[in-house]
Regions:
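C-terminal capping/gating helix-and-loop segments adjacent to ligand/active sites or protein-protein/ligand interfaces
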Residues: 180, 401-408, 419-475
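Extracytoplasmic/periplasmic substrate-recognition and gating elements
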Residues: 326, 335-401
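Periplasmic solute-binding protein
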Residues: 150-154, 175-214, 238-268, 364-371, ...
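Glycine-centered hinge/linker elements that transmit conformational signals in sensory
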Residues: 269-302
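Short, solvent-exposed loop/beta-turn-alpha elements that line the ligand-binding surface or hinge
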Residues: 76-79, 160-171, 238-242, 258-282, ...
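Extracytoplasmic "Venus flytrap"/periplasmic binding protein-like
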Residues: 101-173, 203-214, 313-315, 322-323, ...
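Hinge/lid segment of periplasmic solute-binding proteins
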Residues: 69-79, 144-196, 247, 349
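A structural signal for short loop-to-beta-strand junctions that line the ligand-binding cleft
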Residues: 76, 128-129, 136-137, 167-203, ...
Length: 477
């Protein structure tokens, strides 16, 4: 039975490495299978056409506060009994029910009924609905590129002042930038996921006397020590069916952001900075010295044929490699063997260290953004609520969800991996980079990059030839 990535999987907006909503893991996104959001370009959920058209969320109908509900957190919102706000999303069950539960008190205290409709055809249907004047009041958009295209229609509303205030207070500038189009802020961040983690076994580290590295130099020194001890320091797997190659795109993204920061990273995403640019080439060379180092990984070419699921499955027992760079969802794969996931257990993760002191807390990940197609008072009230620390905390407390909202206390997280991810995602000093290959044209981010990076590992193709081929594949218009 294929692994299903619980709801927070890494790559959102496309179909690639992880799933997108429906089951969750520890990544803040929502997907239902690891080949779905690198996530969304890579693998659609298996549903019938009829089911695709009827994937509608459950509806909360509570419209009046009861004695059991504490309405103090919602005192700033006006009573709007009888009003309904619709939300369209790619998030599916069971996450939809959990979201409704998280919003129940808000609905009870304000009288606003929130109706959420989820569809695995979201990205195809939303533009059609907007063009046909049948847009929802709100939409959770997992792709900044899709947001930009919708803004071009003139139908997306600029975020109201209350939302702007919340985002300025609770999110880093990097996060706000992804909800901004041509200088105007439209969409507040919603859920999030993190990919900048390294999986390892606390028990195996303790037995061998190893310490978790906190700098890149410490990590490479540790890898040398492991190699000297006869161990395989790092492992990796690019295999993912029709999406084979995506893990290598993640490795390059991690290093480009760490080496050069947001300006170069975003220029690379837009192709104003080419793959053949010396800065991108230098980062790829660093990836090669890390993940193509025979002393650390053993059989380099074998990485191209190993599946991403199998790459680190033996980490808990110390029989395979000692470390694997993967997103937070990977804990669910390891846990399938019965391994305990905790800071002192069979497996856990640490933050992939920075490479450049001038780039503070670099984090690669993804997430959704709340865009509005109506400016009715009740819609703006829901917008403000969804961008608040009150909502984010309510959802986090129900488990298996990550928010980059810094107003959420870390104590609210039940899942230790989610808490670890939130520590970095919600850091106000973080330099956040939305998964680059998910933002690039599909012909590149879910096409030539996968193919060329697989050839880079599996065939020993040179960086010069790889970058030349990817640049040549970039759409002309």
């Amino acid at each position: 039975m294929p692994f299903t990535c619980p709801l927070p999987c890494p790559h959102q907006g496309q179909i690639r490495e992880l799933p997108h909503h429906g089951t969750r893991v520890s990544d803040g996104a929502r997907t239902a299978d690891p080949l779905r959001t690198k996530m969304k370009r890579k693998g659609l959920l298996a549903v019938t056409a009829a089911a695709a058209l009827s994937l509608v969320a459950s509806l909360v109908t509570t419209t009046s506060a009861s004695a059991a509900v504490n309405c103090d957190p919602y005192a700033g919102y006006k009573s709007m009994k009888g009003k309904t706000v619709t939300i369209f999303t790619s998030i599916l069950e069971p996450e939809l029910t959990t979201l409704n539960t998280a919003m129940a008190d808000f609905q009870a205290c304000t009288g606003i009924k929130i109706k959420i409709e989820g569809s695995n055809q979201f990205e195809a249907l939303l533009p059609v609905r907007v063009k046909g004047n049948n847009a929802p009041d709100l939409a959770w958009i997992p792709q900044p590129g899709l947001l930009a295209k919708l803004v071009e229609t003139g139908k997306v509303k600029v975020a109201p002042k209350a939302v702007v205030a919340n985002v300025d207070k609770y999110w880093s500038k990097s996060w706000k930038a992804y909800g901004t189009v041509k200088g105007k802020f439209y969409a507040a961040p919603f859920g999030s996921n993190m990919k900048s983690l390294v999986w390892y076994s606390p028990k195996q580290f303790k037995a061998a006397g190893y310490t978790v590295p906190t700098t890149w130099d410490q990590m490479t020194a540790l890898a040398d020590k492991m190699a000297a001890d006869g161990k395989t320091a790092f492992c990796g797997g690019l295999g993912s069916g029709g999406a084979t190659g995506w893990p290598a795109t993640d490795w390059v993204e991690q290093v480009v952001l760490r080496d050069h920061g947001s300006a170069v990273y975003n220029g690379w995403v837009n192709h104003t900075i080419k793959f053949s640019d010396p800065r991108i080439v230098a980062s790829m060379q660093k990836v090669a010295s890390w993940m193509q180092n025979p002393k650390w990984v053993g059989n380099v070419k074998g990485i191209a044929t190993t599946t991403f699921q199998d790459a680190g499955k033996d980490i808990p027992g110390g029989k395979g490699c000692m470390m694997l760079q993967q997103a937070s969802f990977y804990g669910n794969i390891i846990a399938e063997s019965g391994a305990t996931i905790s800071p002192t257990g069979d497996a856990f993760a640490f933050y992939l260290p920075a490479t450049n002191s001038k780039v503070t807390v670099p984090v690669v990940g993804g997430g959704e953004f709340t865009a509005a197609f109506s400016s009715r008072p009740e819609v703006q009230a829901v917008q403000a609520y969804l961008s608040s620390a009150t909502f984010a905390t309510s959802r986090v407390q129900l488990d298996n969800w990550i928010s980059a909202n810094s107003g959420v206390p870390l104590a609210a997280y039940k899942n230790q991996v989610d808490k670890l991810a939130a520590t970095y995602l919600a850091n106000p000093k973080s330099t956040f980079g939305f998964d680059a290959s998910d933002l690039m044209p599909a012909a590149v981010g879910a096409g030539s990059m996968w193919r060329e990076f697989t050839a880079w590992f599996g065939e020993g193709k040179s960086i010069a030839d790889v970058t030349k081929a990817i640049d040549a594949s970039w759409p002309k218009n």
